[in-house]
Amino acid sequence: KKSRNHYNEMAVSLTNEDQVQLTLRFRVFDDGIGFRYEYTVPTVDSLLITDELTTFRFHRDGTSWSIPASAETYELLYQQQPISEVETANTPFTFKTADGVYGSIHEAALYDFPEMTLKQIGHYTLKAELAPWPDGIKARKGNHFTTSWRTIQIAPEAVGLINSSLILNLNDPCVLETTDWIRPLKYVGVWWGMHLGVETWKMDERHGATTANAKKYIDFAAANHIEAVLFEGWNEGWESWGGMQSFDFTKPYADFDIDEIVRYAKEKGVEIMGHHETGGNIPNYERQMDHAMQWYTDHGIHLLKTGYAGAFPDGYLHHSQYGVNHYQRVVETAA
């Protein structure tokens, strides 16, 4: 699929008496707009960003669909409510105006910057809020930096928001030379039994990720044309759950024969999707990440799902600059 990337651009450059340079860059597409801030402060080496003053003001009330703002999770219930009654929201913040136009506020090119959420400040106005570091600072940057794009998409019907390429077009170009190995797929796996309490993540008499159970799921996937199977609780360390999780990402439990499982899956035409649950312990995972991904490759596993079911240490937030940079490192290492 090819996307049309046609837009009009305007850059407004400002310089104050201290030679601080700010460029406001706008790109207007047929179905929306993106804008960002580009700063250069020549008299310093680094900058601490304490707030962002961007606001989105609606002319009058309308209907909205969103989840409450959270710097830790997206696993919240969506709410339909008047724009005027929204207290906080994660993006994308989807809305319908009184004139029947659909729209969405979101962001693009989120690199080395905290996620943006929205906060109601009155008069149908939503202010940008950035997920902070533990000390309250929103972002740490050098003396020249560019923010993420802030985006507003519009469409006559809601489906137009899904079909829009605006955010894709505002993201940086792909740096990979080949992308034919990237593909969507369906997968099933061992995890829901743990939530129901009939299986466990750690190795005991109810352990879910066993060789025998793995083969049952592989058989089911093959019979139902499902491309891959994932197993939670396959590796040592689940005994530490609830504290400072210390998983080992290259040591399967004794009842999980990874070589036999991969062999059996290949025989059935099914792939194994690896699982790295960090429990939020990012330092522990990053120490092992390169070796753990290579270990999967050496065992014939080329798919990976990471997990972050737990708070980050020392007050770091999932959607902060710290979290965004970690996820970027994971993607780049996997690629």
Question: For each of these PLM feature ranges, what is it?
Answer:
Residues 133, 176, 215, 227-237, ...:
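Intrinsically disordered, low-complexity acidic regions
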Residues 232-335:
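Aromatic- and carboxylate-enriched substrate-binding clefts and catalytic-loop regions
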Residues 1-177:
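N-terminal accessory beta-strand-rich subdomains and adjacent acidic, glycine-rich linkers
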